């Protein structure tokens, strides 16, 4: 891709999004949409697919080789493996692989009698899984995972989801190299189109990360795993901790009020990881819930230190928890809204660096919306 934007880099880095925290005022979610039949890949599901677990790498176990310890449930909300298989069988599905359970249910790759294409079953207690199912039932966009069916057996809900060949994390790991800028922009555009749609429906995902981006090919990508999603959200609100520490926005880590702009930060991290692989901006994920809470503080300090956040880049509201708790850690060694010095070590493509810089604006009010980002020249050319 040509560097047509190079001449405007100075202006772009000095220009910020409208500081208002406005969001689209939209009608309620559209009526339920019919089931769709997207193209499937015959490859086995990767280990990070379709799971709600937010910290650490996930592993899947083959049905025939699962250890006895896998049968034990750490959470009463997760049906036993035998119960999940019984439910799947009662609906005519044959389980061909069991994935590591998520925080809200069992996840299995299965086929239905007479239908050779594999699907993924997410089986959990009605109260939790059904909420996610109801949300997915009412969304319809090619860049958002399409739920094929919702099945209920007593107190258990079974979501039927399309099977993708990989998630973006596994895709990057297998490629073991940076994704070329033209391909990365095609992927990022689809992610932003999905977020634009969700945000217009007043839904925020709250856990956008490479593990939750499913991919069959560069031009067939979707946002998945809505276990942490929140609806309806219009104005910034106290929504609590959710998602993954390493990709959470500063306002989420500080437990301040936030809205859809939190997803933009996370999508910026995804773009950085595509363009800078294997480099990451922020590492050391927590391994326990206790560490998760503690690491929110350390992660926020790491963001301020790594990006050398200037005090002028904090929210204007002095009562914000982000301001009250963290402005004292800000630095004056970098002028506000200028290039983050840490980008120099990874040598990002100029278009990619500009986008990441905009999406990682520390103050959510200065962060562009998905709609604004999609209007940028590098996406208009695709």
Swiss-Prot record:
Feature: compositional bias, Polar residues: 12-24
Residues that coordinate or bind ATP: 99-107, 122
UniProt-recorded name of the protein: Serine/threonine-protein kinase
Keyword Glycoprotein: no
Biased composition (Basic and acidic residues): 1-10
Acidic residues: compositionally biased ranges: 45-75
EC top class, as a word: transferase
CDD domains linked to this entry: PKc
Catalytic activity: L-seryl-[protein] + ATP = O-phospho-L-seryl-[protein] + ADP + H(+); L-threonyl-[protein] + ATP = O-phospho-L-threonyl-[protein] + ADP + H(+)
EC number per UniProt: 2.7.11.1
SUPFAM superfamilies referenced in this protein's UniProt entry, alphabetically: Protein kinase-like (PK-like) (SSF56112)
Domain Protein kinase: 93-379
Keywords: ATP-binding, Kinase, Nucleotide-binding, Serine/threonine-protein kinase, Transferase
Keyword RNA-binding attributed: no
Active site, per annotation: 207 (proton acceptor)
Family to which the UniProt record says this protein belongs: Belongs to the protein kinase superfamily. Ser/Thr protein kinase family.
Top-level division of the source organism's lineage: Viruses
Organism: Equine herpesvirus 1 (strain Kentucky A) (EHV-1)
Gene Ontology terms, MF aspect: ATP binding; protein serine kinase activity; protein serine/threonine kinase activity
Residue ranges of the region described as Disordered: 1-75
């Amino acid at each position: 891709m040509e560097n047509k934007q190079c001449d405007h880099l100075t202006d772009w880095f000095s220009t910020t999004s409208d500081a208002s925290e406005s969001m689209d005022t939209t009608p309620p979610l559209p009526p339920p949409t019919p089931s769709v039949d997207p193209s499937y890949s015959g490859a086995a599901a990767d280990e990070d697919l379709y799971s709600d677990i937010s910290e650490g790498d996930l592993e899947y176990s083959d049905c025939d080789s699962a250890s006895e310890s896998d049968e034990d449930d750490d959470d009463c909300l997760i049906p036993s493996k035998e119960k999940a298989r019984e439910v799947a069988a009662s609906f005519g599905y044959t389980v061909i692989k069991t994935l590591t359970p998520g925080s809200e249910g069992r996840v299995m790759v299965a086929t239905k009698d007479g239908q050779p294409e594999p699907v993924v079953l997410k089986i959990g207690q009605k109260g939790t899984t059904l909420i996610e199912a109801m949300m997915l039932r009412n969304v319809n966009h090619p860049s958002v995972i399409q739920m094929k069916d919702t099945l209920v057996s007593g107190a258990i809900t079974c979501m039927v989801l399309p099977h993708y060949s990989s998630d973006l994390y596994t895709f990057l790991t297998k490629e073991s190299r940076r994704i070329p800028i033209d391909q990365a922009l095609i992927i990022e555009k689809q992610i932003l189109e999905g977020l634009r749609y969700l945000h217009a429906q007043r839904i925020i995902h709250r856990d956008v990360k490479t593990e939750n981006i499913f991919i069959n090919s560069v031009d067939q990508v979707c946002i998945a795993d809505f276990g942490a999603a929140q609806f309806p959200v219009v104005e910034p609100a106290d929504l609590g901790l959710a998602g993954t520490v390493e990709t959470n926005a500063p306002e989420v880590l500080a437990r301040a009020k936030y809205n859809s702009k939190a997803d933009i930060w996370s999508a910026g991290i995804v773009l950085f990881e595509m363009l800078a692989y294997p480099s990451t901006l922020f590492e050391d994920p927590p391994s326990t819930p206790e560490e998760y809470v503690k690491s929110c503080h350390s992660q926020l300090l790491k963001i301020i230190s790594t990006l050398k956040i200037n005090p002028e880049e904090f929210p204007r509201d002095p009562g914000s928890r982000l301001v009250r708790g963290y402005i004292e850690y800000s630095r004056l060694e970098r002028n506000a809204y200028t290039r983050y010095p840490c980008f120099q070590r990874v040598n990002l493509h100029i278009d990619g660096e500009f986008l990441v810089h905009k999406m990682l604006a520390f103050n959510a009010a200065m962060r562009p919306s998905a709609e604004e980002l999609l209007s940028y020249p590098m996406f208009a050319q695709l």
